[in-house]
Amino acid sequence: MARVTVQDAVEKIGNRFDLVLVAARRARQMQVGGKDPLVPEENDKSTVIALREIEEGLITNQILDVRDRQEQHEQEAAELQAVTAIAEGRR
């Protein structure tokens, strides 16, 4: 297991408190949301993977926000399409 130092990640995010929030959010995405890691897993836990992604500049709070908005938009579009199909079928 690779040892992770958080200093590089703190420098990418700004402060250690925001780092905790961003890393936890990303780790949760991988664990619960089924998102794939952006770095090799190397048998690491999702929290370590999240920190490595942040260290490499692949994940920031802004990137997570944009991805969440895109996914929400796609989900809303799919729901609208389904409702439209149901409504057209009733005519």
UniProtKB/Swiss-Prot annotation:
Catalysed reaction(s)?
Answer: RNA(n) + a ribonucleoside 5'-triphosphate = RNA(n+1) + diphosphate
Q: Which domain of life is it from?
A: Bacteria
Give the record's GO CC terms: DNA-directed RNA polymerase complex
The record's section on Pfam families has: RNA_pol_Rpb6 (PF01192)
Entry-linked InterPro entries: DNA-dir_RNA_pol_omega, Pol_omega/Rpo6/RPB6, RPB6/omega-like_sf
Asked if the Swiss-Prot or TrEMBL record annotates the protein with the keyword Signal, the reply is no
Keyword Cell wall biogenesis/degradation on entry: no
Q: What class of enzyme is it?
A: transferase
As recorded in UniProt, its EC number(s) are 2.7.7.6
Q: Name one GO biological process term.
A: DNA-templated transcription
- Which function does this protein serve? Promotes RNA polymerase assembly. Latches the N- and C-terminal regions of the beta' subunit thereby facilitating its interaction with the beta and alpha subunits.
Family membership noted in the UniProt record? Belongs to the RNA polymerase subunit omega family.
Q: Quaternary structure per UniProt?
A: The RNAP catalytic core consists of 2 alpha, 1 beta, 1 beta' and 1 omega subunit. When a sigma factor is associated with the core the holoenzyme is formed, which can initiate transcription.
Q: What is this protein called?
A: DNA-directed RNA polymerase subunit omega
The scientific name of the source species is Erwinia tasmaniensis (strain DSM 17950 / CFBP 7177 / CIP 109463 / NCPPB 4357 / Et1/99)
Gene encoding this polypeptide? Answer: rpoZ
